A protein has these predicted regions:
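Short linear sequence motif anchored by a di-proline
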Residues: 1-106
Length: 106
């Protein structure tokens, strides 16, 4: 992961491409509207659209960052955003999440 990224597609385009169910009926509602459309400077700790699969694909908002199991403070999630692909499965901070807790970040 990197420190910032962009989302250039709208919710309808993403649902068509990835085939996920969505709880978002009005993408402009107060609760989640600003987080679902195109954005060009998405930063750590902001809500991001993800797709999970527990038997069916679901679109949902999640907070960007990783809070390792040993962390005493949730704020560490703002710093845990950069995993090297070659070592993520071996590093203690990323190992369990890498093996068991995956999602597609859109």
């Amino acid at each position: 992961m990197c420190g910032r990224f962009t989302l250039t597609s709208n919710l309808d385009e993403l649902q068509g491409r990835f085939g996920f169910l969505s709880e978002f009926t009005d993408s402009h509602s107060f609760d989640h509207g600003p987080w679902l459309g195109p954005r060009y400077n998405i930063a750590p700790t902001q809500p991001v659209l993800t797709v999970t699969n527990d038997g069916q694909r679901r679109g949902q908002l999640m907070r960007w960052g990783l809070v390792p199991f040993w962390a005493k403070d949730l704020k560490i999630g703002a710093r845990m955003i950069n995993a090297v692909g070659e070592t993520a499965s071996a590093k203690p901070a990323f190992r369990a999440a890498f093996k068991k807790r995956r999602c597609l970040v859109l």
